[in-house]
């Protein structure tokens, strides 16, 4: 028997071989046994090198073309199947969901519904704004006690004929004059062309014998003196304005007649001013 041993070099740790020679007439048989070895370790895969040659295959080979038009369908890229393309179907009305159907048939109905909603909303907003403005304005108005003080009752029997009495009303002097028949006829005969602020005597009174005026001069706010002046009515001592028995400016710097307040005769002997 012949034994041969050979060095396997760097593979010695993992390989082992035996060869034997037998002198006989039969054919020589050689048996080789390989010991079981573990799997070699897996190395990191080779990363591709980013170069012009490696990237040229991924670029487009033909020019890119974009098509724009009213009837051109929108392009959808299906590279990712997990992305849902929005079509806004949930926000569209049922009449216009079908893209192949014309929307002109349902145009009138849709417009009518929109107009109805808009008109209803406008009416509601207007009513709400009216209520808010009304409450705001009413909050600024005078209270009941202030309104009660804004009126004054005057007993006419206390004022003799030909006399003028002064009262305090809303912080201003109030003149109530009981005119004689001569004063009534004299003031009614005055021509409007002679007046700076033309106004007939009958337009300033409700009863000719009673003349009710606010005693504030229309020039600078002084208080005139009754039964004085060149015309027997009122005279302002501040700057010399003369008024007649109807409270009309006749001479001096005052531009307007004396103001006539709002009043009402509740009886023959009682008048309420305010």
From Swiss-Prot:
Disulphide-bonded residues: 222-238
What's the protein name? Cytochrome b-c1 complex subunit Rieske, mitochondrial
Note how many cofactor molecules are bound and how: Binds 1 [2Fe-2S] cluster per subunit. Fe-S cluster delivery to the Rieske protein is mediated by components of the iron sulfur (Fe-S) cluster assembly machinery that reside in the mitochondrial matrix (including HSC20 and LYRM7).
Q: What PANTHER family would the database entry show?
A: CYTOCHROME B-C1 COMPLEX SUBUNIT RIESKE, MITOCHONDRIAL
- Gene3D superfamilies reported for this sequence: Cytochrome Bc1 Complex, Chain I (2.10.210.10), Rieske [2Fe-2S] iron-sulphur domain (2.102.10.10), Ubiquinol cytochrome reductase, transmembrane domain (1.20.5.270)
| Cofactor(s), names only, from the UniProt record | [2Fe-2S] cluster
Q: Name one GO molecular function term.
A: metal ion binding
Q: How does it sit in the membrane?
A: Single-pass membrane protein
Domain of life where this protein originates: Eukaryota
- Which residue intervals are topologically Mitochondrial intermembrane? 141-274
Which EC number(s) does the record attach to this protein? 7.1.1.8
Q: Where in the cell is it found?
A: Mitochondrion inner membrane
Looking up Pfam families in the UniProt record yields: Rieske (PF00355), Ubiq-Cytc-red_N (PF09165), UCR_TM (PF02921)
Other comment:
The Rieske protein is a high potential 2Fe-2S protein.
Q: Reaction catalysed?
A: a quinol + 2 Fe(III)-[cytochrome c](out) = a quinone + 2 Fe(II)-[cytochrome c](out) + 2 H(+)(out)
Q: Does the keyword Transport apply?
A: yes
Iron-sulfur recorded as keyword: yes
């Amino acid at each position: 028997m012949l034994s041969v041993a050979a060095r396997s070099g760097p593979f010695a740790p993992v390989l082992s071989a035996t060869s034997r020679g037998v002198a006989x007439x039969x054919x020589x048989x050689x048996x080789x046994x390989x010991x079981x070895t573990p799997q070699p370790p897996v190395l990191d895969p080779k990363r591709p090198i980013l170069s012009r040659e490696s990237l040229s295959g991924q670029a487009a080979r033909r020019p890119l073309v974009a098509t724009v038009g009213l009837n051109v369908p929108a392009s959808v890229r299906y590279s990712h199947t997990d992305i849902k393309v929005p079509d806004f179907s949930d926000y569209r009305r049922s009449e216009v969901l079908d893209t192949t159907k014309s929307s002109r048939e349902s145009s009138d109905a849709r417009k009518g519904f929109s107009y109805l909603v808009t008109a209803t909303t406008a009416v509601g907003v207007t009513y709400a704004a009216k209520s808010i403005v009304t409450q705001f304005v009413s909050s600024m108005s005078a209270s009941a006690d202030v309104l009660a003080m804004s009126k004054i009752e005057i007993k006419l029997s206390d004022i003799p004929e030909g006399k003028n009495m002064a009262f305090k009303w809303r912080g201003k002097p109030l003149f109530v004059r009981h005119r004689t028949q001569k004063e009534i006829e004299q003031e009614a005969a005055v021509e409007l062309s002679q007046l700076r602020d033309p106004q007939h005597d009958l337009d300033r009174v409700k009863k000719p014998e009673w003349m009710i005026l606010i005693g504030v001069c229309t020039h600078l706010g002084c208080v005139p003196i009754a039964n004085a002046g060149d015309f027997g009515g009122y005279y302002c001592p501040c700057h010399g304005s003369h008024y007649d028995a109807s409270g009309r400016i006749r001479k001096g710097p005052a531009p307007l007649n004396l103001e006539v307040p709002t009043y009402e005769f509740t009886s023959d002997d009682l008048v309420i001013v305010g």
